A protein has these predicted regions:
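Cationic-aromatic interfacial patches
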Residues: 22-163
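Well-ordered beta-sheet/strand-loop patches within structured domains
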Residues: 21-64, 129, 136-137, 156, ...
């Protein structure tokens, strides 16, 4: 008997006593005895294997009267081989196949090919349990995510997915129907983009295995424009086009420009063809870098609740600086607009809610943190700051306070018992309209008077709220089922100088998420800068 077989044998039994007991007890009895004897489910081994899905194993085997699921008459079922292949394929889900006992599955399959194990019921019982443990662990990680979202310090506050499946029942059905592979794929998130991203990860693994070692990192020194000559162009051309014997290798020509523009678009940069520090950084991304990035974003999709695909919903991707109003599982886009999100130290949180009303010509009651942290110092330096910005000081009972009557030299963040409110109008920091989805973060979507900021590549300038580039158009789309609010009425309300709140007939799900990589239905990749430095934390949890 090959030595590897003994990885499945508990160490404190001798081989002879194992065989003697196994002849007396059937496989089902051995499975029951193993599960009864250890609530921790530790499998003695060269290194210990934990039955982390112990509760599900109990449910699965008790319903089938502890009968084996993966072996028959001493041989492995064809579905055992399918499961092993699915575990290998979990690499392209951004997971680690060894976490699902790939090595043990390979050893078992190899040894079954060498000799039958039908005389050893205890050994067959452990084989069965390992395959079931592998299936259930992979299934739960694909469905819920491998890393608990609350344990990762990435400000992810989206409501956790409600578990709607009974994993043990799905396994039972898959075993009976010889559909293990199909059932595993059924645990993928419902978002169609998941399968697209998964294929991109497969491509990057192929690139990583075929790439030349020690690819030099490009070093930025100065801007390179079309027609410039630069030694760096030689390496850039080699990466994007390949060698060209009849080409001036140091000249930035139109052929290379086309490829540079593709890179800039893929990374969400301004496609101007100018090779600057951001473009150099994009060109320095290796397949290994991309593998980690993609794995992180697959995990984020596994965290998302399925409820947002049931109807129309609003999605804001912070890292992409874009809002999309979509339907049909995100495949049909009804509206899109650039957005501005929170600065790194006032980052926009990742959460979900329901948009319930719109406010035209809004006032702005300045959050106390901004009043204390930013406004009081500005007012002290410039007494006209409040009047220039159309702001008033109010008591919490609503009485207006004359700023000239306050002794500003003695005012501090600790002794300012007032609120500051900005009147409606084009000067208002919220612009001419705000879209409210009540949440504990006091974050909402709104217009802004600072339109020039939308021309920037990196648009992280706000205090956490989401500033919208095309607010009037968005209001039209949101209110299209309300006959009282046509384009003219919306324009009038936005410029009336008086607050008007409009309740939506049906609340719209809103998801504020953070994706730094995704792939569209055409296989085109989109890569975005990790502006809040959140990817590394998740990658560490996934792979370490």
């Amino acid at each position: 008997m090959n030595k590897i077989i003994f990885v499945l044998v508990i160490s404190f039994f001798s081989i002879l006593s194992l065989q003697a007991q196994s002849k007396e007890l059937g496989v089902a009895s051995e499975i029951r005895n193993i599960l009864e004897s250890s609530s921790l489910g530790e499998l003695s081994h060269d290194s210990k294997v934990n039955f982390s899905q112990y509760d599900l194993l109990i449910k699965f085997y008790s319903k089938r009267e502890f009968k084996e699921a993966w072996t028959k008459e001493g041989g492995l079922s064809s579905q055992a081989l399918v499961l092993r292949d699915q575990v290998r394929e979990s690499l392209y889900d951004g997971l680690v196949p060894e976490d699902y006992y790939l090595g043990q599955l390979d050893d078992i399959i190899m040894n079954f090919e060498i000799e039958k194990m039908g005389e050893n019921a205890l050994q067959l019982a452990y084989v069965d349990l390992i395959f079931s443990e592998s299936y259930l662990k992979l299934a739960t990680d694909l469905y819920k995510g491998k890393t608990p979202q609350e344990a990762i310090k990435t400000n992810w506050q989206i409501q956790a997915k409600t578990v709607k499946v009974k994993f043990e029942e799905v396994l039972e059905s898959a075993v009976k129907g010889d559909s293990i592979g199909q059932s595993i794929r059924g645990f993928w998130p419902e978002y169609k983009v998941y399968a697209n991203i998964r294929e991109s990860l497969r491509d990057y693994y192929k690139m990583a295995s075929s790439q030349e070692e020690n690819t030099p990192e490009l070093e930025y020194k100065k801007l390179i424009k079309l027609g410039d000559r630069n030694r760096l162009i030689v390496e850039i051309r080699s990466r994007l086009i390949g060698e060209g014997s009849e080409v001036d290798s140091e000249l930035y020509d139109s052929a290379l420009l086309k490829e540079v523009l593709k890179v800039q678009k893929r990374f969400g940069l301004n496609p101007d063809g100018v090779i600057g520090p951001a473009t150099i950084s994009a060109l320095n991304e290796t397949p290994e870098d991309m593998i980690l990035r993609i794995a992180v974003n697959l995990e984020r999709l596994r965290w998302l609740p399925d409820t947002v695909v049931e109807d129309k919903f609003i999605m804001v991707n912070i890292a992409n600086y874009q809002l999309d109003y979509v339907q049909d599982n995100g495949l049909d886009t009804l509206f899109s607009s650039k957005v501005i999100v929170g600065k790194q130290y006032r980052s926009t949180p990742v959460f979900n809610g329901e948009m319930s009303y719109i406010v035209f010509s809004p006032t702005w009651t300045v959050p106390l943190s901004i009043v204390r942290g930013e406004m009081i110092p500005k007012i002290k330096r410039d007494p006209s700051y409040l009047s220039r910005n159309h702001m008033k000081i109010l008591t919490y009972s609503g009485k207006e306070v004359d700023p000239a009557g306050l002794e500003w030299s003695t005012v501090s963040v600790k002794n300012f018992p007032y609120m500051v409110r900005q009147s409606p109008g084009p000067h208002n920091s919220l612009g001419l309209v705000k879209f409210i989805f009540p949440n504990k973060f006091n974050v909402y979507i709104h217009d802004t008077p600072s339109k020039s900021l939308f021309d920037k590549d990196i648009r992280a300038f706000s205090h956490g709220c989401i500033r919208l580039h095309k607010p009037a158009e968005f209001a039209e789309v949101i209110l299209q089922d309300n006959a009282l609010w046509d384009k003219e009425k919306i324009y009038e309300a936005m410029h009336s100088g008086k607050e008007t709140a409009v309740m939506l007939k049906k609340k719209i799900p809103v998801v504020i998420l953070y994706l730094t990589f995704w792939t569209d239905t055409g296989g085109k990749n989109y890569i975005r800068k990790d502006i809040y430095n959140r990817d590394e934390e998740i990658a560490r949890a996934l792979f370490q």
